[in-house]
Amino acid sequence: MWIQRTVKDYLTLHFIILIWGFTAILGLLISLPSLELVFYRTLISSVGVAGLIYFKKESLVLSSSQLVKIMGVGVLISLHWITFFWSARLATASVCLAGMATTSLWTAFIEPWVNRTKVKWYEVVLGVVVISGLLVIFQFESGYWLGLSVALLSAFLAALFSVLNGRLSKKHSPYQITFYEMLAACLFALLMLPFYNGLMTDAQVIQWAWTDWDWLWLLILGLICTVYPFSVTVELMQRLPVFSINLTMNLEPVYGIVLAVIILGESEKMTPQFYLGTLIILISVLIYPVLNYWNKRRKAVRTLG
């Protein structure tokens, strides 16, 4: 029964990552600049979660200390998305994704530090292996050190908010967490707009209005590609290790490329490097549950002995 539940959880996780892979396509379809996009995405998401909470008749009441903790994580999420888009602007998509590949490696150190446990050697090794897999796929370009540095910061923030969400998921419902985090991310993005536009977009005018089908793509992005996967991911953190989730998340660009080819008919060819890099990541993702199970068995034997 436990194995069946775990397999189901991992299949759900892969489905969520497939949905997140679709966000890259939506990003191409939406005409809004990056931070305005983050603002509308989080605004729509927070309203959508509020509607779900209303129909489920769940409570939104939290103590002030709990509220500060959850909304603090929401600010980290907003900072992660902002630095992610900034990195892509400073460098290239491949450099940005190469930096983001370090998320699982950061998690291997942050999770034990936050939870006061020992660092697991195989998590560090798998984190490094996944980085090599993504470097093979995207063939990292040198000369973009500032963009890479910002991407590393974004990856650190992603690892940090994931680990903190793992702790919050033990005490609060996924919908409570998602609502307040999306609300905080939305408010922080709104406060950051003047600074972001002045520093990172050559002082362009803030673009509030959308065009053509932007409203539809924003609704899909905010509701289907954010509310559902974010809430379910928080729920999965109650049962799956945060490292395992972040390790599997490295398949998002792979799924995104495949979906882009299928849906948009992208001209990019699936090179041998793509298949080799994907294989490296897949092996890392698939071997982690085995190593984790082996580690738990070894500890159990030591305890009994």
Q: How should these model regions be labeled?
A:
Residues I53-K56, T103-V125, V254-Y275:
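C-terminal transmembrane-helix exit sites in multi-pass transporters
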Residues W2, T42, D214-L216, N250-G305:
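C-terminal-most transmembrane helix of multi-pass membrane proteins
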Residues V49, M71, V119-F138, T271-N292:
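Hydrophobic transmembrane alpha-helices of multi-pass small-molecule transport proteins
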Residues L18-F22, L26, L52, M71-W86, ...:
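Hydrophobic alpha-helical transmembrane segments of multi-pass membrane transport proteins
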Residues L32-L79, T102-T107, A159-L164, F179-L199, ...:
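Transmembrane alpha-helices of multi-pass small-molecule transport proteins
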Residues M1-F39, V75, L79, T83, ...:
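Glycine-/small-residue-enriched transmembrane alpha-helix faces in small-molecule transporters
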Residues I25-L28, V49, T107-F109, Y144-A203, ...:
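Transmembrane alpha-helical segments that form core, pore/gating elements
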Residues Y10, L97-T102, N165-C186, T226-I262:
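Helix-helix packing/entry segments at the starts of transmembrane helices
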